[in-house]
């Protein structure tokens, strides 16, 4: 990948000038000037998904300049480099090949001289066989009872992706109960274990290195809990599975090789749900539905790889995001999924985006002097409307938003869904167009007081609008469409990383926190108050802990 600073490109300078020209334009005026604006700025994917980006503060010339920026930043070759397995994660000397995990054409993908599709298919077949045993009640616990509860122990990408997908596909769930333990806070695992019977519980320990502190602490607690019931280590075989790249560490923990599901160092954690990390997904919804998830992602991969940028959905959404982030200085981006089962989606995208593009060093190894990844946040509709939409409608911040919904619900209450859709359509309209001539119902007898009161309240009811949004409408939320949607956002994040000239697939900030926590943990276990080699604040916090923990 080329190392090009975006603000040195001709298109960046042109975009800056263009921004000054149109920054005061109102979305409602853009619609008035162009009766075909929706048609011009919307795309359909596979006749299943509509992406409407017409309610943005853009013109055709804006898109033209953004596409010019993508070309100047060598985006096309960067995409090809990722898909072909070149070392684009340079700081860790790794390829980035999560797309290979859903390569449904099964065409050869060569990495380090080997066709990795052989290993991918082998693991998929193992996942299929194992999940069939568990789902069909043929995998039995130490007393001969069939498994009723699965506990996925992992954090970050080993937790958020599978948890999001399983909740999203709630209507496809089988009889198995799936639980997630991620936080090292003991309350997390305590609240899960107290509901379970060890005779019918299966633990899946998910860790890329099998050394992640939070995961291993929780795994050891689960192991002790199980041993209290079974008393014999050999009985653990029926109750512990590992998903990792480090088989040796998993075996050191006590998990036999036959119970280990491998993945590879070219799979980043936040992009790993397509691998054996998705074993809990397979157990929850069955292997056929997992294949549909892969199929959908593969279709979006092909769209991203082969479609010209002016019709390329991930590229266009990414570039529009850059437009707000780097020229309007918007800083945040909201995700509003109007589906209760998608309540983990914004958290999932938060990790995908902020861990990938929350960087201040460019690919040349210098500090950037432009904005990189935005702050991602969100809440399912309509709850958010009664929490923070007020700020969107009448606050002082520019907050671009993605609104997502499906047409056909997965529940029988059709009237509920019509109400939900009406809110969805209304909010994007209100945010874009606002309301300037408010009517006010005030019941006051005195005419003069009434007129004064009416004028005062009407002014407070003004909503200026001009808040941009994209609308993504699915025909229905099924595994195939969910695969499309997740892959769309993955490629959006990568595209923005290319434009920002950063490495999107490392996370050295996360690693720093891990190292410091290990060191501080050792100091917490020493006796007496001390002045450790930290700042006075950290020393004071540790010593306050010691004083009060000794009093309990």
From Swiss-Prot:
Keywords: Cytoplasm, Gluconeogenesis, Glycolysis, Isomerase. Pathway: Carbohydrate biosynthesis; gluconeogenesis; Carbohydrate degradation; glycolysis; D-glyceraldehyde 3-phosphate and glycerone phosphate from D-glucose: step 2/4. Pfam families: PGI (PF00342). The keyword Nuclease does not apply. GO terms for cellular component: cytosol. InterPro entries: G6P_Isomerase, G6P_Isomerase_C, Phosphoglucose_isomerase_CS, SIS_dom_sf, SIS_PGI_1, SIS_PGI_2. Its main location: cytoplasm. CDD domains: SIS_PGI_1, SIS_PGI_2. The active site is at 355 (proton donor), 386, 514. It catalyses: alpha-D-glucose 6-phosphate = beta-D-fructose 6-phosphate. HAMAP family: G6P_isomerase. This is Glucose-6-phosphate isomerase.
